[in-house]
Amino acid sequence: SSAASDVYKRQLHYGDVPAFTPERWDFTITGLVAHPQRWTYEQFSKLPHVTETYDIHCVTGWSKLDNTWEGVRVRDLLRPATVLPKGQFVMVHGDEDYTTNVPLSLLLQEGALIANKHNGEPLTPEHGWPYRLVVPGPYFWKSAKWVRGLELMETNERGFWERYGYHNDGDPWKEERYSWQER
């Protein structure tokens, strides 16, 4: 096994792994939308799932190339919600009050998924089961585990790690790791 795959097996999250109860799980789209959306786990798991392949980059310095993800396209989830013109930013909400912020434009990319499989296998609880956000481009902390909802917002408010000193954008090609690097 490669060093990158060994690193991927380590704990790379804050706090405990949330317990998953299918009857209590839901996924919502709220905020600056004309039609807020809510799916139960059963409903969400029946939505069309697609496969995308891209690299992931961790803020700690490692990358894992050619990852295949299976899940629901974020832009397909946003379509029935009808994002209002002022809703240009998204607060991604996960279990345990975890949040991360991304521009709406990143989630409208074809590759942005709410994923339940990685490299053909169901996600493990440690890696976000039953669903995690995966966004091609930024450092992987922006791809929130245990994702439960998207809140459309007018302003780019900071999420959990961004409030604790991580860069607001997290572009690995610009090495945007820390908030002190912001201009």
Describe every region a protein language model picked out.
Residues 73, 113-117, 122-155:
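Active-site scaffold segments
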Residues 24-26, 53, 71, 87-89, ...:
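Extracellular structured ligand-interaction cores
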